Amino acid sequence: METRATLRGVRLSVDKGRLVADLIRGKKVDQALNILNFTQKKAAGIIKKVVESAIANAEHNDGADIDELRVKTIYVEQGATLKRFSARAKGRGNSISKPTCHVYVVVGN
């Protein structure tokens, strides 16, 4: 039995998200939440909410036992990039890219 949760379009670099996702892949959910609590990264708080959502989905929709759940799959994909413009001296301009990503979490036995 597998249950999933997704978060799309979050303002986070895909590389920074993957760095945290690699920490909890394959771990039990209580151990994964403990790791995320003590990881001092912006991505840790975002991914923690998605993992908690997947746990709640498994408990409510499938009636799963929380103690047996593991993070089976977690991956972070690149989303759309917000492109902005910053005015510079002498009529020039620089482009600023603000990346987004999508977080997918699958929990199961």
Swiss-Prot record:
InterPro entries: Ribosomal_uL22 (IPR001063), Ribosomal_uL22_bac/chlpt-type (IPR005727), Ribosomal_uL22_bac/org-type (IPR047867), Ribosomal_uL22_CS (IPR018260), Ribosomal_uL22_sf (IPR036394). Coiled coil: none annotated. Keywords: Ribonucleoprotein, Ribosomal protein, RNA-binding, rRNA-binding. The keyword rRNA-binding applies. The keyword rRNA-binding applies. GO terms for biological process: translation. It comes from the Bacteria. Belongs to the universal ribosomal protein uL22 family. Part of the 50S ribosomal subunit. This protein binds specifically to 23S rRNA; its binding is stimulated by other ribosomal proteins, e.g. L4, L17, and L20. It is important during the early stages of 50S assembly. It makes multiple contacts with different domains of the 23S rRNA in the assembled 50S subunit and ribosome. This is Large ribosomal subunit protein uL22. It comes from Polaromonas naphthalenivorans (strain CJ2). The lineage of its organism: Bacteria, Pseudomonadati, Pseudomonadota, Betaproteobacteria, Burkholderiales.
